[in-house]
């Protein structure tokens, strides 16, 4: 089975940044993408574990995949698509 985290349109590296910077960078990057594009975000900030899913729900994006068992945390987000 293919790992969905290996297939994405855009990449956002927020390693070393702390709240609220990863979320602010995600918001800015998402604005430049079109509906249906995928964004892989990596972070080492533990606050992203709750912030990213909440952001996706609030902004109407779909958190397609998440790896949070070790750093870097990885989030695959489908822009403007609830599912």
UniProtKB/Swiss-Prot annotation:
A GO cellular-component term linked to this record: cytoplasm
InterPro entries named among the record's database cross-references: Sulphur_carrier_TusA (IPR022931), TusA-like (IPR001455), TusA-like_sf (IPR036868)
Membership in a protein family: Belongs to the sulfur carrier protein TusA family.
Protein name, UniProt field: Sulfur carrier protein TusA
NCBIfam families assigned: PRK00299.1
Pfam families (UniProt xref): TusA
Subcellular localization: Cytoplasm
Record: active site: 19 (cysteine persulfide intermediate)
Gene Ontology molecular function terms on file: sulfur carrier activity
Function: Sulfur carrier protein involved in sulfur trafficking in the cell. Part of a sulfur-relay system required for 2-thiolation during synthesis of 2-thiouridine of the modified wobble base 5-methylaminomethyl-2-thiouridine (mnm(5)s(2)U) in tRNA. Interacts with IscS and stimulates its cysteine desulfurase activity. Accepts an activated sulfur from IscS, which is then transferred to TusD, and thus determines the direction of sulfur flow from IscS to 2-thiouridine formation. Also appears to be involved in sulfur transfer for the biosynthesis of molybdopterin.
PROSITE patterns in the record: UPF0033
Principal localisation: cytoplasm
Keywords: Cytoplasm, tRNA processing
Pathway entry: tRNA modification
Highest taxon above the source species: Bacteria
Keyword Secreted carried by entry: no
Subunit composition and interactions: Interacts with IscS.
PANTHER family to which the protein is assigned, alphabetical: SULFUR CARRIER PROTEIN TUSA, SULFUR CARRIER PROTEIN YEDF-RELATED
């Amino acid at each position: 089975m293919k790992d969905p985290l290996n297939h994405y349109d855009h990449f956002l590296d927020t390693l070393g940044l702390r709240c609220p910077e990863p979320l602010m960078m995600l918001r800015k990057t998402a604005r430049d993408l079109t509906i249906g594009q995928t964004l892989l975000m990596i972070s080492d900030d533990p606050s992203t574990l709750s912030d990213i899913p909440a952001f996706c729900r609030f902004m109407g994006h779909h958190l397609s995949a998440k790896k949070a068992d070790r750093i870097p945390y990885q989030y695959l987000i489908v822009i403007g698509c609830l599912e």
